A protein has these predicted regions:
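Conserved AMP-binding
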Residues: 21, 31-35, 118, 169
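Gly/Ser/Thr-rich phosphate-binding loop
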Residues: 47-50, 70, 80-137, 146
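Surface-exposed loop/turn positions
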Residues: 25-26, 50, 67, 95, ...
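Alpha-helix capping/helix-boundary segments
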Residues: 58-59, 75-76, 97, 172
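Conserved AMP-binding/adenylation subdomain of ANL enzymes
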Residues: 1-26, 35-67
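AMP-dependent adenylate-forming
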Residues: 8, 110-113, 128-222
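His-Asp-centered acyl/peptidyl-transfer active-site segments
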Residues: 22-23, 27-29, 39, 83-86, ...
Length: 222
């Protein structure tokens, strides 16, 4: 996937994607470098003057001294929040987050439930979760990005209706390297933004809630 500097900068240099990282903050490096979310850890930390805490075999040892954690729910589930008193911000993505895990961490830190495939530059929606909320959503599009919930004919669906989520805006990557057939299948001109903008077919199912949040409801190819 051809991800551009512009794509990455749009996530890291705007909030909430910047995760409030400040000079001197410690960000735990928990993820495999082959995973796109590792770029969020590494580049997000260094861009804002933070200190990257390189892990050994013990993830908790790195998390214990960190202010910010970025992880998949599976990785995060192996870390006890009580063992990480410094942590003030947590972001998860890469797979659906169990509600109990979100509630447990949100009681101690700013907890962001996020969503987005590699083709939309790590994540393109984020939600700061409140344990008292009725739903655990994937939130709203991050700055300069859009999400369209469309029917099979690529027409927008009303609030509450389930459809396929297409991503638009600054997050949309430049396509697959040397794969025109797959590019034609997954990328399309964005009729809503117009011009040279393109949108990406995520194959994720979702719907808008009445208060403008996105609910993730699985995959079209499950």
């Amino acid at each position: 996937v051809k991800v551009t500097h512009r794509n990455v900068a749009n996530l890291l240099l705007t909030e909430p994607g910047g995760l409030g990282i400040r000079p001197g903050d410690r960000v735990a490096h928990l993820l495999n470098v082959a995973f796109d979310m590792a770029a969020w850890e590494i580049l997000g930390c260094l861009t804002h003057g933070g200190t990257l805490v390189i892990r050994g075999r013990d993830l908790t040892a790195a998390a214990r001294t960190a202010d910010v954690l970025i992880a998949t729910p599976t990785v995060l589930s192996g870390i006890d929040p009580a063992a990480c008193p410094r942590v003030r911000t947590v972001a998860v993505a890469g797979e659906p987050c169990p509600r109990p895990l979100a509630d447990r961490w949100a009681a101690r830190a700013a907890f962001h439930n996020c969503c987005g495939p590699t083709e939309t530059t790590i994540v393109n929606t984020m939600s700061r979760h409140d344990p008292a909320a009725a739903l655990l959503t994937i939130g709203r599009p991050t700055p300069n990005n859009t999400v369209y919930v469309l029917d099979a004919d690529r027409r927008p669906l009303p609030i509450g209706a389930v459809g396929e989520m297409w991503a638009g805006g600054a997050c949309v990557s430049a396509g697959y390297l040397d794969d025109p057939a797959l590019n034609a299948e997954r990328y399309a001109p964005d009729p809503f933004l117009g011009g040279e903008h393109r949108m990406f077919r995520t194959r994720d199912l979702g719907r808008w809630t009445a208060d403008g949040q996105l609910e993730h409801l699985g995959r079209t190819d499950d």
